[in-house]
C-alpha cells in the first residue's frame, strides 16, 4: 500500500466518509550550498521521492481535525475561531497548528478541514521531514479553499510557522524546494529574492543519500553559534549579509577579523561561488567538475565551518575512494552528523553501496542507511 492508498483508507475508516483530495510535498537533499541560505546566498537542492502525503476534505464548519498515521493515529482537533496555541504533548501537532495559524494571518478565507497525514521522509536525517509537512499542510488549505497563494508564499508560511510557532530557526531553502521542486531537475535558489532557476540533472546520474546514523546532538546550539558568527562577519563589512561581501574584499582584511569568524566567513563566501558554478556544471552535464566542487565544499565545511564529524568524513572518504572523479560526494544538511549526498553514475551505485557496507560499520561501529533517490516534483495533488 502506498502512502496515498494508506491515508485514503484510514480517512474513510476514521472519519466515515471519503477524502476529496490527496496532497503530497517532498523532502529534499541539498546538492551544494551549505549554511548559505541564512546569509542571503545560493543553494542547489533537489526534491526527492520521499514525501509527506495528506488525504483531506473540507468541512462545513470551523473545526480542523488531524490524524497522524505515523504516530499511532493520534488525533489533534482545534477550532479556527479560537486562538491557536501550542499542543502540550504532541510535537507533530505544532507543525500543523503553526502552519494554520500563520495562514490565517496571510489569508483567512478558509474553513475547517479533516486530514490524515503519513510520510516516509526519514526523520532526524536532515532531509527536511518538517518542511515537507509544513508545505503539505499549507497546500491542503490552498487547494481545498482555492487560496491565491503561490508556492513561494506557501513555503514562506511554513518557514514562519517553524521559526515563530515551533521555535526552530531555519532558513527558507527546505520549504521552497518542497513547494517548487521540479522532476529531473535541481533548483538554484537565490535565498534573498527567492528566485529559483530549474537546473536539469544529467541523464543516468543517481542521487545517493547515505545516513551516517550518528546521532546529532550539537546541532541546535552550534547552528545558532554559526549564524551569530556570520552576522558578526557581515557587520564587520558593514553589509546586510555575507551575500554582499566579495572574496577579494574579504582576503584584503581577513587578518583583522577574529580568526574563527574569518574561517566562517571564508566558508560562506567560497561556498556561494561554488554553488553558482555547480549549477552551470550540472546543466552542462560536467559531473567531473561537479565532483570537484562537492569535494571543495566538504573540505570547507570540515576545516573552515567545522561542522562535520569523523563518522561523516569517513563516509565521504569511502565513497570518494570508490568513485574517483566520476561524480562527487559531500556532507549535506546542518552538520554534526546526518547524511552525505553523492551524485554518481547509476552503474556505480552497487559498488558504492558495497564499499560502504563493508567499511563504514567496521570503522565506526555504526550501520549506515542507504537511499537512492530521484529528483522529484514539488508539492501538489497526487
UniProtKB/Swiss-Prot annotation:
Any GO CC annotation of this UniProt entry: cytosol
SUPFAM superfamilies, per database record: GHMP Kinase, C-terminal domain, Ribosomal protein S5 domain 2-like
Membrane-spanning residues: none
Catalytic activity, EC: 2.7.1.6
Residues engaged in binding substrate: 34-37, 223
Keyword Lyase attributed: no
Organism: Salmonella agona (strain SL483)
Signal peptide range: none
SS bonds (residue pairs): none
HAMAP family documented for this protein: Galactokinase
Pathway(s) where this gene product acts: Carbohydrate metabolism; galactose metabolism
Protein name per UniProt: Galactokinase
Amino acid at each position: 500500500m502506498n502512502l496515498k492508498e494508506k491515508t485514503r483508507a484510514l480517512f474513510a475508516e476514521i472519519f466515515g466518509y471519503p477524502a476529496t483530495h490527496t496532497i503530497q510535498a517532498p523532502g529534499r537533499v541539498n546538492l551544494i550550498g551549505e549554511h548559505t541560505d541564512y546569509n542571503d546566498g545560493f543553494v542547489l537542492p533537489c526534491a526527492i521521492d520521499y514525501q509527506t502525503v495528506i488525504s483531506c476534505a473540507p468541512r462545513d464548519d470551523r473545526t480542523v481535525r488531524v490524524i497522524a498515521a505515523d504516530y499511532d493515529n493520534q488525533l489533534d482537533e482545534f477550532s479556527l475561531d479560537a486562538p491557536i496555541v501550542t499542543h502540550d504533548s504532541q510535537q507533530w501537532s505544532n507543525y500543523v497548528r503553526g502552519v494554520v495559524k500563520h495562514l490565517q494571518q496571510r489569508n483567512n478565507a478558509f474553513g475547517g478541514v479533516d486530514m490524515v497525514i503519513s510520510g516516509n521522509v526519514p526523520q532526524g536525517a536532515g532531509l527536511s521531514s518538517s518542511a515537507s509537512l509544513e508545505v503539505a499542510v499549507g497546500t491542503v488549505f490552498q487547494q481545498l479553499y482555492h487560496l491565491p497563494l503561490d508556492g513561494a508564499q506557501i513555503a514562506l508560511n511554513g518557514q514562519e510557522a517553524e521559526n515563530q510557532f515551533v521555535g526552530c530557526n531555519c532558513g527558507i531553502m527546505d520549504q521552497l524546494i518542497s513547494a517548487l521542486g521540479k522532476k529531473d531537475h535541481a533548483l538554484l535558489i537565490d535565498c534573498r529574492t527567492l528566485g529559483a532557476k530549474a537546473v536539469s540533472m544529467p541523464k543516468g546520474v543517481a542521487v545517493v543519500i547515505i545516513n551516517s546514523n550518528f546521532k546529532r546532538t550539537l546541532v541546535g546550539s552550534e547552528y545558532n553559534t554559526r549564524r551569530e558568527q556570520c552576522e558578526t562577519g557581515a557587520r564587520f563589512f558593514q553589509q546586510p549579509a555575507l551575500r554582499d561581501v566579495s572574496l577579494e574584499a574579504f582576503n584584503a582584511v581577513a587578518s583583522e577579523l577574529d580568526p574563527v569568524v574569518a574561517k566562517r566567513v571564508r566558508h560562506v563566501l567560497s561556498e556561494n561561488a561554488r554553488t553558482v558554478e555547480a549549477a552551470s556544471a550540472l546543466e552542462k552535464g560536467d559531473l567531473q567538475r561537479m565532483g570537484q566542487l562537492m569535494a571543495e565544499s566538504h573540505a570547507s565545511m570540515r576545516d573552515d565551518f567545522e561542522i562535520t564529524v569523523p563518522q561523516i568524513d569517513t563516509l565521504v572518504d569511502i565513497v570518494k575512494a570508490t568513485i574517483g572523479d566520476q561524480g562527487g560526494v559531500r556532507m549535506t544538511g546542518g552538520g554534526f552528523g546526518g547524511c552525505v549526498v553523492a551524485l554518481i553514475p547509476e552503474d556505480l551505485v552497487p559498488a558504492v553501496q558495497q564499499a560502504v557496507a563493508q567499511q563504514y560499520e567496521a570503522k565506526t561501529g555504526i550501520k549506515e542507511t542507504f537511499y537512492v533517490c530521484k529528483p522529484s516534483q514539488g508539492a501538489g495533488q497526487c
